[in-house]
A protein has these predicted regions:
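Short capping/connector residues at structural and topological boundaries
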Residues: 53-55, 165, 187, 203
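Active-site neighborhoods of metal-dependent hydrolases
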Residues: 1-139
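Acidic, glycine-enriched loop/beta-strand segments at the rims
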Residues: 87-98, 141-147, 155-192
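C-terminal cap of metal-dependent C-N hydrolases
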Residues: 99-105, 110-111, 126, 175-204
Length: 204
């Protein structure tokens, strides 16, 4: 689906126009995904970064192409030798990410695999990356809209009562950050760096 976000969003909008209930979808601010190591994902990726390997744990954090060269085989044989394993796949377009982020029905969020030896930076960087890079620097949307897409909109969509807003009798889930300095520091080489500009996180 690389480069096809216009078609995808048009399909969503066509279905939304014919229904009383809105359709929401989630997006995260990266051009790479992360899951188990498998051939069909390798086939469509420009780059593959190994996050963990049970059989060869010392190779976590390295590019699959480099591992294949070292093992003197193709990338599929290298993948077979690493199994079971996980990987990050660079297979998305930055233009698509920005277009989807700007859509009013897009919720911002992420899952993650924190047990990986070399995890995806989304675990540490998703929300500050949106607030700092896409909202403040690229000005894709106002700060208030960015916060709403991460909090109230998601809570409303999934029916999470008393969540997602600063309101009397609601659970006090609060992040205190500096809008001028907030930014992700985690990247694919150092994925566990704490974000900048976040002073405090309060839960319940």
């Amino acid at each position: 689906n690389f480069g096809r976000s216009k078609e995808t969003l048009a399909c969503f909008e066509k279905h939304m126009a014919g229904h009383h209930h809105g359709i929401a979808f989630d997006v995260y601010p990266y051009i790479a995904s992360s899951t188990v190591l498998k051939n069909d994902s390798i086939q469509v990726a420009e780059r593959v970064l190994i996050t963990w390997s049970k059989s060869r744990p010392e190779l976590a954090g390295r590019e699959l192409s480099d591992i294949a060269e070292e093992l003197n085989c193709d990338i599929y044989e290298a993948a077979a030798q690493l199994q079971p394993a996980g990987a990050i796949y660079f297979a998305m377009s930055e233009e698509d990410v920005q277009r989807i982020l700007q859509h009013p029905n897009a919720m911002i969020g992420s899952d993650g695999l924190p047990h990986d030896e070399h995890p995806h930076p989304r675990l540490w960087g998703t929300f500050p990356r949106v607030l700092g890079h896409y909202c403040r620097d690229l000005k894709l949307f106002p700060l208030e809209e960015a916060v709403r897409r991460m909090t109230g909109y998601s809570a409303e969509t999934f029916g999470l009562s008393k969540r997602g807003m600063l309101k009397q009798d609601f659970f006090a889930d609060i992040t205190i950050f500096d809008e001028d300095t907030v930014l992700d520091a985690a990247d694919f080489e150092c994925p566990t760096k704490p974000a900048k500009g976040i002073d405090c996180v309060l839960v319940n």
